[in-house]
Amino acid sequence: MKQFLDFLPLVVFFAFYKIYDIYAATAALIVATAIVLIYSWVRFRKVEKMALITFVLVVVFGGLTLFFHNDEFIKWKVTVIYALFAGALLVSQWVMKKPLIQRMLSKELTLPQPVWSKLNLAWAVFFILCGLANIYIAFWLPQNIWVNFKVFGLTALTLIFTLLSGIYIYRHMPQEDKS
């Protein structure tokens, strides 16, 4: 259910873009993200930090897009989110000395410290590369290609990278945890 809720604003954005335009899609994205946030709070009595950060950025960049009638703001939102994620991962590893991935998953998984560090760094690099790809596609290719990349390309890349991370984790799990 939670995964569906995470993707709902993206689906709404895509549908409104195809039916109307980028500005209607942006307004719909703001509303859908707010509804998902409210529903999460009412249903689960919890809102994850990532969801809250994403909501704030959607409202800020979406609001700027609508106010100035300029789609560049909503295009930048994707890169800013990825930069924040990458930054949080890198700060957790290099400043706080405990990778964020480890903080999030250590209750469920037992892995050697170097594996946590490599996994954390890999996700940081992944987010940086996705942010850079977004900049290129958003500002050098037509808007419709960017929307398709945002909805399908980044989603597919994230699913593939998650699968690869799962394989990497499985290879380094203690034998007793694999069963």
UniProtKB/Swiss-Prot annotation:
Membrane topology note: Multi-pass membrane protein
Family: Belongs to the YciB family.
Lineage: Bacteria, Pseudomonadati, Pseudomonadota, Gammaproteobacteria, Enterobacterales
Membrane-side (Periplasmic) residue stretches: 1-21, 71-75, 142-148
Assigned keywords, A-Z: Cell inner membrane, Cell membrane, Membrane, Transmembrane, Transmembrane helix, Virulence
Record flagged with keyword Coiled coil: no
Source organism per UniProt: Shigella flexneri
Keyword Membrane: yes
Pfam families linked: IspA
Side of membrane Cytoplasmic, spans: 43-49, 97-120, 170-179
Transmembrane segments: 22-42, 50-70, 76-96, 121-141, 149-169
Any Gene Ontology CC annotation: plasma membrane
Location of this chain's protein in the cell: Cell inner membrane
Physiological role: Plays a role in cell envelope biogenesis, maintenance of cell envelope integrity and membrane homeostasis. Essential for normal cell division. Involved in virulence through intercellular spreading.
Gene responsible for this protein: yciB
Protein name: Inner membrane-spanning protein YciB
InterPro entries per UniProt: YciB
